[in-house]
Amino acid sequence: LGPLPTPAVSFLTKSLRADLGIMISASHNPYEDNGIKFFDKDGLKIDTKIEEEISKEIRNKSPLVVPSDLGKASRINDVLGRYTEFAKITIPSNLSLGGIRIVADCANGAAYKILPQILRELGAEVVSIGVAPDGFNINKECGSTKPEKAQKAVLENSADIGICLDGDADRVLFIDEQGKLANGDIVIGLLAEAWVNKNSLNKNTVVATVMSNLALEL
């Protein structure tokens, strides 16, 4: 598929009716690091037990399969276009970002094209940073682990909001108009409240990690 955000691989695994999705990524780490993520046919993270079995096989240094037994690889064109359209239709059709100025920090990573493009197509004025990947500068002094540059850009450009992704675009930080980082639990709470007011929060339930503040339960 080529360089893609991790969520795009999740979506495309199901969309293309594949049996398995594989993402090569070190997430928010520097370029020297690397890792691998697996998705099942529904685009969901595979079961932990299966991950452990795969790790065991790798540690045991299983014999390599000869190339002739592997089949062949082919590239599918315009997968980014497919994911772009999917991402856009998750936004209500009556919602426009017109008149909103957004700083988008893409961490010199996989979303360096797609995030600014989607925001502009939704009507926003976009100030892009971290959009010049060279294979070595991913997550370097930018993105969700180093939001200071984006915070400064929000103030310098009188932006309404800042969005910081990590290298593979599966985590996000928000910056308010004053250049301050938005607390993730508060963001979840605000979204939940908005959906409750529209009677669109399924079962009036929010799913959060164990790291989230218990105040969300109130």
PLM feature segments, named:
Residues 1-33, 117-175:
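N-terminal small/polar loop signature for handling phosphorylated ligands or for N-terminal nucleophile
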Residues 6-10, 111-112, 214-217:
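Short, well-ordered alpha-helical microsegments
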Residues 24, 104-107, 165-167, 208:
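Active-site flanking residues adjacent to catalytic metal/cofactor-binding acidic residues
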Residues 52-85, 89, 178-218:
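Proline/glycine-rich low-complexity loops and linkers
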Residues 101, 162, 205:
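Hydrophobic "anchor" residues on beta-strands that sit immediately upstream
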